[in-house]
Amino acid sequence: MNIAKKLAALLLLTIALVVTSTSSAAGTKKSNGGPLRRAELKEAESRLSKMGYRTGRVDGVIDSATQQALVTFQKWEGRRLTGRITRAELEAIRSATPPRPKDAGYKHVEVDLDRQVLLLTDDDGEVTTILPVSTGSGKHYKEKSMSGLAYTPRGRFRIYGKLEGWRKSPLGLLYYPSYFSDGLAIHGNPSVPHAPRSHGCVRIPMSAAKEISERLPVGTIVLIYDAQSFVSAKEWVQ
């Protein structure tokens, strides 16, 4: 009888462990694989916004501004460009640190050609705004009476001229252009592909163009670089 009771107790314990394990696995699957709650979406927006990504309203509603901010985050972090906030993306956002510029200590703009991302800093060199860009495609073009290489120059520049609103150029329309080199500008454009597609200008989203223009007075330093071409401009501000 004692042996029978022990066997029965062991069987009941085994069943209880199996049920507990199954319930735990189901709960984990539900919490990890289910859709994000609005509070979690709002958390993702809030964290992105605090790091400098332009999310628009932080309200837990995934609109075009939120998607654009997420793509910019994914560009910077080297993640797959989906524009979707999944649970994996939320965890990546939670563990991310704010982007840091290559140069620090003074106000300037940096355009990272490899990431296709623009960083705008404050007077102390801390990043305040992060935007997606599309720069020169690197291909030869021929449009109307013009032809050339669609190239965004690397190096250090200064904003030397600005226009408000739209400006019609031989190669297209520029919205709130801030010129930095030989007619090339940082400007708004309705089309900002994930990859380099411009004739050489630095395209930014239309929604940010006016604000960015107002924050780039003539004389603002612009650093444009890829992995092999960074040049500091600290000596210009010493």
Mark where each language-model region is:
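A structural motif detector for short, solvent-exposed N-terminal "entry" segments of globular domains
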Residues: R94-K139
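Intrinsically disordered, low-complexity Ser/Thr-rich linker and spacer segments
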Residues: K29-K30, L36-R37, L81, R87-H108, ...
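Bacterial N-terminal signal peptides that target proteins for export
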Residues: M1-L11
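Sec-exported extracytoplasmic/periplasmic mature domains
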Residues: S46-R54, V71-R79, R94-P98, D123-E126, ...
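Sec/Tat signal peptide C-region and signal peptidase I cleavage site
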Residues: T22-T28
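Exported/periplasmic cell-wall-interacting domains
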Residues: G27, R38, K102-A104, L149-R154, ...
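Bacterial N-terminal signal peptides
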Residues: A9-V19
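Short acidic, glycine/serine/threonine-rich helix-capping segments at coil-helix boundaries
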Residues: S31-L41, S46-Q68, T72-A92
